[in-house]
Amino acid sequence: MLIFEFCAENLTFIDKAIAAGAGRIELCDNLAVGGTTPSLGVIQEAIKLTEEKSVDLCVIIRPRGGDFVYTDLEVQAMLADIRAAKEIGVSSFVLGALTSDRKLDQRVMQLLLAACGEAEVVFHMAFDELAHTDQLEAI
């Protein structure tokens, strides 16, 4: 089944995207830097909009723009964002983490995936930063 996904910056255009046939909304903030984690208030309102239209919602977990190599402090912030988002009803996340040599950061990904629990997880554009030979292994 083909799913049309719309990447929404905050609440802007979610209604129009759904009306145009989007089957899933990827919610983020700061698209100019590739997307960052939106506020809890924005997430709550997006949940209301998507639930009433029976459209899936995925929330990006990314503490900042730039690369996908995160400090321990940033990882802790990501874990806190996942926990908080789950508490208000998020069941699908978009995330990813790499090492400084552009490999999948296994340690960080294990922490993030464990925090997500049973939630659906989509690996974001960090995947494109992996060497082609590493992409298959990462899957």
Where are these regions (language model features)?
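Hydrophobic faces of well-ordered beta-strands that scaffold small-molecule active sites
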Residues: L2-A8, I25-L27, V55-I61, F93-L95, ...
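Surface-exposed binding patches on compact interaction domains or structured appendages
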Residues: D67-F68
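Active-site-adjacent beta->alpha loops and helix N-cap segments on the catalytic face
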Residues: L11-K16, L31-D56, D72-Q76, A97-G117, ...
